[in-house]
Amino acid sequence: MPSRRDLPAIAVGTTATLAAVGLARLAYTPLLPAVIHQGWFHSSQAVYLGAANLLGYLLGALLAVRLSERFDTRKLLGLSFVAIALSFVLCALPAAFSWFFTWRFISGLAGGLLMVVGPSVALTAIPPERRGAVASFVFTGIGMGAILSASLIPMLLRLNLSAAWLVLGLLSIVAGLLADWGLRRLAINHASTAVKADAALPVPALSLATLLVVLAYGLDAIGFVPHTVFWVDFLDREKALGTDAASMQWLLFGIGAIIGPLFAGYLGKRFGWRRSLALGFFIKAAAIAIPLLSITLFWRSASSLIVGIMVTGLVTLTSGRVMELVGPASYKRVWGIGAVSFSSAQALSGYGMSALYGILGSYLPLFAIGSLVMASGCLLLMLTPRAQTVPATSIKLCKNES
């Protein structure tokens, strides 16, 4: 278990994942039906606003490592939190589609930066023997964001839609202040020096095992989209269950997302990172497919809870597997590559699925696609060598230019 000395690192990592994904992305999911119901945007426009965040996230993940090496960590993270807060506050009133698209894109960009840099800063500041326990807490921020949005947004919507946007902006500011508290107490100067010194060295080749994990993580991003972007609107409008019933499912998703990292940490210790990661892909593939068979209360609740568990659980399992394969010295760069793989596939699938919905007028085929892709990722991970830390290919990471 983490000790009190780990609280600053947990604060930094958890608030980073809370703002980056839990708020900047997942909080839009329960807002989506309301944006359509209240006539702010047509359904086809509203789903593209969700995809705008995914596109920004891709750019943020691409820039994260380079920016973190050139700029002060505290300032970079602080600006990212401010950008996410502004993206909510400045969208609190109806405006042009281009205005909303721009700020959803900016929130994604800031989220990509936070998701790569925040956990890396937190985990590299922790001794190896406690790193796994801290990682389990760091990624609970994703679920916290889903729970906050599921709990608060239905109540706020009874006031008006603008109130929901403003409160999400306030939560982003609070998260940023907590992260700054943690950063001021971490040995940032020492951590930054270590990262920069390592960046100046030749970067090792990626092993075959690492490449397969990175590719599988990209496939996870495609399976990630149906529930995290379209699930609430699917239940609310397409299946006519109403806002309250759909919000309850989003709450279950959030509860699962908080359980996920802790469950993943247990699996990793019990069965090893390699086997646990493949098992996680299989479970998520099955849970995504549940709506294809039934959306009765029991089955839709099972789908919400299990997918929530595996959304954050797979992030934790992938992070643990990468750390196992490459070690702490190369973790930040390889995790950055994994984030780029994830965000690239996520952005492409977000736009592709939005376009497919526009053509078909139904979300149901998207769940079939997500499930099949996750099953493919499971097969890919089963091909992964058991334990390979020595590079097996000549494919290398880009060297840092001094």
Question: Model segments located where?
Answer:
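A late C-terminal transmembrane helix in Major Facilitator Superfamily
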Residues: P328-L360
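Paired small-residue
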Residues: S98-I106, F298-I306
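Helix-to-loop junctions at the C-terminal end of transmembrane segments
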Residues: G60-D72, G260-G272, G358
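Extracytoplasmic gate region of multi-pass secondary transporters
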Residues: T29, A209-L251
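Helix-breaking motifs and short loop linkers at transmembrane-helix boundaries and internal kinks
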Residues: W40, D72, L93-W99, A240, ...
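Conserved MFS/SLC helix-loop-helix module at the cytosolic interface between two early adjacent transmembrane helices
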Residues: L59-A95
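Helix-loop-helix hairpin linking two adjacent transmembrane segments in secondary transporters
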Residues: P128, F137-R184
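Cytoplasmic helix-loop-helix junction between adjacent transmembrane helices
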Residues: W103-G141
